[in-house]
């Protein structure tokens, strides 16, 4: 990849991992595979349903890849929640990734959004119809305050994706625009609130810690994602409306200056995340730390982010940052590099095909009247 600032990326990544004291020990290998398969299996059966297949209209390979990516993110990061909660969150966040990759204009289906919502009618937009159907399965795990954050943040995410349809990076001089859009489509509040299921936390007792965690996670989670995504998005035509690129446009600065701005804010947020919760409820701190470490492991190990390419490029270099990065990468790979064949089975397309054949056979059964049944 030409012109990619490899040395700068290595230095930034190393500082981030050192600040959060990266040491992912969330699972044994057996536990990780068990949780991955449980969440994947439930989510795969959900998306194999005829209604989901018909309304989403997503290429089977893309849906499969999206599901595997999200299951990995949830299982690696939400290490403290139940397997059932992991599965329901995996379904919800897969819906968000499907929307993020969509290029359909939402305007026509959103004309009567509030009227339909108020009247209790099914939403005209197929994504909202499906997400609303699944939402009760997600919200049952959380108290009312966390649930409201999940609902509100999901609505913000939809609006953020709507804005991104225009491939608009902001007007020069509009300094607030990049962070506005990133907060809108980052799902930070949804992620921050979904770490506290009611079977583990009393949201009234831990209200102050939870509220602060939601506030801190909003930036930390999306900024880390932006840093870890910078390599894969660097020369991808589909990823030109990123926070870094929008900094360049709106702040009228160079790409290096924009990356440095993101770097400093991410590192500051990481320091805050560790410092603020260091003397708070140990269970809260443990949950946050497990999330941060698992979230980093997921980025380093998931093929979507292509960070293994950086590793292969620099593993023989003798610089301090290269050696530290490779050590962290190998540490992550030792716990998180699990082949999809070990847990992501059967494929969604196969499950959907079986369901479709079963429905055809059911439809072909002879109809018997009540009189014939009696006879």
Swiss-Prot record:
Pathway: Sesquiterpene biosynthesis; trichothecene biosynthesis. It catalyses: (2E,6E)-farnesyl diphosphate = trichodiene + diphosphate. It is an enzyme of class 4 (lyase). Keywords: Lyase. Its EC number is 4.2.3.6. The keyword Disulfide bond does not apply. One of its GO terms (biological process) is sesquiterpenoid biosynthetic process. Gene3D superfamilies: Farnesyl Diphosphate Synthase (1.10.600.10). InterPro entries: Isoprenoid_synthase_dom_sf, TRI5_ascomyc, Trichodiene_synth. GO terms for molecular function: trichodiene synthase activity. TS is a member of the terpene cyclase group of enzymes. It catalyzes the isomerization and cyclization of farnesyl pyro-phosphate to form trichodiene, the first cyclic intermediate in the biosynthetic pathway for trichothecenes. It serves to branch trichothecene biosynthesis from the isoprenoid pathway. Trichothecenes are sesquiterpenoid toxins that act by inhibiting protein biosynthesis. Belongs to the trichodiene synthase family. This is Trichodiene synthase. The gene is TRI5.
């Amino acid at each position: 990849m030409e012109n990619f600032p490899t040395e700068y990326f290595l230095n930034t990544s190393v500082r981030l991992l050192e600040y959060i004291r990266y040491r992912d020990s969330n699972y044994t290998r057996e536990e990780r595979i068990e949780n991955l398969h449980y969440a994947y299996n439930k989510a795969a059966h959900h998306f194999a349903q005829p209604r989901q297949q018909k309304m989403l209209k997503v290429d089977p390979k893309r849906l499969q890849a999206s599901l595997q990516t999200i299951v990995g993110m949830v299982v690696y990061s939400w290490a403290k929640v139940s397997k059932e909660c992991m599965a329901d969150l995996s379904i919800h966040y897969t819906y968000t990734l499907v929307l993020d990759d969509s290029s359909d204009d939402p305007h026509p289906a959103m004309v009567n959004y509030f009227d339909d919502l108020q009247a209790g009618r099914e939403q005209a937009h197929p994504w909202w119809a499906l997400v609303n159907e699944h939402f009760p399965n997600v919200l049952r795990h959380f108290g009312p305050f966390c649930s409201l954050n999940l609902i509100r943040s999901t609505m913000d995410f939809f609006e953020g994706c709507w804005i991104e349809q225009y491939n608009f990076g902001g007007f020069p001089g509009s300094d607030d625009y990049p962070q506005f859009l990133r907060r809108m489509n980052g799902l930070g509040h949804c992620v921050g609130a979904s770490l506290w299921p009611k079977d583990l936390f009393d949201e009234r007792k831990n209200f102050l810690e939870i509220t602060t965690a939601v506030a801190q996670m909003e930036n930390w989670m999306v900024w880390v994602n932006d840093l870890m995504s910078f390599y894969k998005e660097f020369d991808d035509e589909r990823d030109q409306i990123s926070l870094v690129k929008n900094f360049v446009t709106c702040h009228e600065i160079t790409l290096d200056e924009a990356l440095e701005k993101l770097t400093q804010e991410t590192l500051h947020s990481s320091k805050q995340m560790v410092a603020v919760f260091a003397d708070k409820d140990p269970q809260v701190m443990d949950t946050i730390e497990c999330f941060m470490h698992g979230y980093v492991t997921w980025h380093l190990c998931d093929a979507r982010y292509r960070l293994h390419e950086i590793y292969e490029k620099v593993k023989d270099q003798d610089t301090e940052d290269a050696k530290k990065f490779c050590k962290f990468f190998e540490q992550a790979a030792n716990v998180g590099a699990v082949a999809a064949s070990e847990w992501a089975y059967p494929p969604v397309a196969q499950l959907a095909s079986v369901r479709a054949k079963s429905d055809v056979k059911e439809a072909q059964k002879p109809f018997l009247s009540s009189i014939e049944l009696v006879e």
